[in-house]
């Protein structure tokens, strides 16, 4: 979407941890380029096209055109609210890959047979953080909870992960960024973090603006985790294993910026599509979906499976 709030210039300039750093087209193009030799050897090719809608109201026309043009693989970079529309439009005529939305509902109540996720869920991010805290024996967390619906969903995922890995929430305090003088205490980081009985401060801030200045601003000298400080990411530009430096360098040359998690998810989605086209081109799309779920499709030597949200 041209008016996608995640890509407003102000937000991109802030470079909030875990947020997109730019549109995902360069990452998809890199995935196709990286897969070109293998595809050519198998007698196949793929073409990356960009389909954009000016707004959510115009999205239906764009999706219908993709279906009319028989585009069989869609890499989605959409807000969560538009996924149901994309799934309905595609039906069984396209495989869909979510490359940027971490909402747990897309893996649960809104799960679809033809929808796969190359981008991790909020539950996965929360599990990663909780596992690390447990490994370091940082068992007591002060939670700073934002007021927005997305903040609440982050908080719910965190509480499930914390319970699973034995992280105790010693207190939950609400924060709010506001120009109202009567609410200034809700944005006072020193006041919010004044208690001494916690090992870490876990901040649930989907927007990122409050968390942006929280590290090193707490009253007690404690690590900040969640939306800033120690952040669970799908990818980092300094990852040095599994061919990471080479991928990062190729992407930086193409996009003129570092690769972030959403870029990696788009890249690996296209690589997954290339693997399907190369090895299972004669299979119908529902059968290709089954092969993806069964772990029989290999991407760069690793099994590609559909991430699932942990059970309650």
Sequence positions of predicted segments:
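Extracytosolic ligand-binding ectodomains
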Residues: 1-312
């Amino acid at each position: 979407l041209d008016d996608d709030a995640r890509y407003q210039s102000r937000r991109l300039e802030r470079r909030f941890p875990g947020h997109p750093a730019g549109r995902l087209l360069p990452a998809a193009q890199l995935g196709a380029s990286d897969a070109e030799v293998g595809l050519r050897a198998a007698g196949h090719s793929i073409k990356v096209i960009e389909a954009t809608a000016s707004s959510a109201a115009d999205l239906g026309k764009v999706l219908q055109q993709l279906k009319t043009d028989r585009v069989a693989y869609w890499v989605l970079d959409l807000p969560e609210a538009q996924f149901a529309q994309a799934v309905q439009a595609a039906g069984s005529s396209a495989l869909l890959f979510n490359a940027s939305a971490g909402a747990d509902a897309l893996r649960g109540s809104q799960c679809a047979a033809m929808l796969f996720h190359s981008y991790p869920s909020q539950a996965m991010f929360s599990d990663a953080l909780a596992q690390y805290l447990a490994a370091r024996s940082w068992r007591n967390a002060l939670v700073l909870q934002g007021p927005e619906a997305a903040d609440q969903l982050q908080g719910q995922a965190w509480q499930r992960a914390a319970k699973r890995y034995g992280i105790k929430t010693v207190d939950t305090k609400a924060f709010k960024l506001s120009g109202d003088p009567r609410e200034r205490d809700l944005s006072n980081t020193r006041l919010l973090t004044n208690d001494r009985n916690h090992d870490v401060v876990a901040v649930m801030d989907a927007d990122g603006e409050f968390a942006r200045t929280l590290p090193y601003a707490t009253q007690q000298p404690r690590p900040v985790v969640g939306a800033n400080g120690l952040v669970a990411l799908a990818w980092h530009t300094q990852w040095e294993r599994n061919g990471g430096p080479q991928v990062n360098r190729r992407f930086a040359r193409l996009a003129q910026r570092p690769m972030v998690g959403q870029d990696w998810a788009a890249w690996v989605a296209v690589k997954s599509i290339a693997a399907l086209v190369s090895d299972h081109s004669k299979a119908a799309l529902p059968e290709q979906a089954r092969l993806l779920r069964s772990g029989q499709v290999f991407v760069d030597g690793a099994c590609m499976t559909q991430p699932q949200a942990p059970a309650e």
